[in-house]
């Protein structure tokens, strides 16, 4: 769990930034492939101990890819505590939208091999976003998959708490960043 506050954004030339991020994405993906995939339960315990959430906070999770930390045990624990949950819905070039979800709900296929709540589920505005990542730096800037979905979403939601879920090796001193990149909390 990474908790950092927003810092000033410093830009790099676009071509160099794209190249640096692409190289780092590959390194991080390769490293993450070799990690244990049973981090969900310890993550849930650590999060519940460390992150104070209002009783009525709406929490957004994500449906994990095979090499990502699995947030489902945490989402199940939050649901048991009475929190409303939602998962992201992806539309190319737009901020994420969020639809209500419970651990018993069936998901449908979304873009980019994602899983998302069905279109008949109500939209929700999360107070806390659990965010997947490939790497995160000491200022809270994350390296995602390159689509900019979470950056656009964090910029729009503004006051929502952004919490990155990562293995320790995914933390680094400073990542390349552009003016559009938004840090996690």
In which residue ranges do the predicted regions lie?
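A residue-level signal for conserved active-site and pocket-lining positions in enzyme catalytic cores
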Residues: 28, 61, 85, 130, ...
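Generic detector of intrinsically disordered, low-complexity, polar/charged segments
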Residues: 58, 107, 141-145, 161
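Surface-exposed, charge/polar-rich loops and edge strands
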Residues: 2-23, 30-34, 120-129, 137-142, ...
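N-terminal active-site beta-alpha-beta segment that forms phosphate/nucleotide-binding
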Residues: 2-124
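Short glycine-rich anion-binding loops that position phosphate/pyrophosphate groups of nucleotides
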Residues: 64-67, 134-138
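Charged helix-capping and loop-helix junction motifs
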Residues: 76, 145-150
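Short, structured patches in soluble enzyme cores that scaffold and shape functional sites
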Residues: 89, 116, 133, 166-169
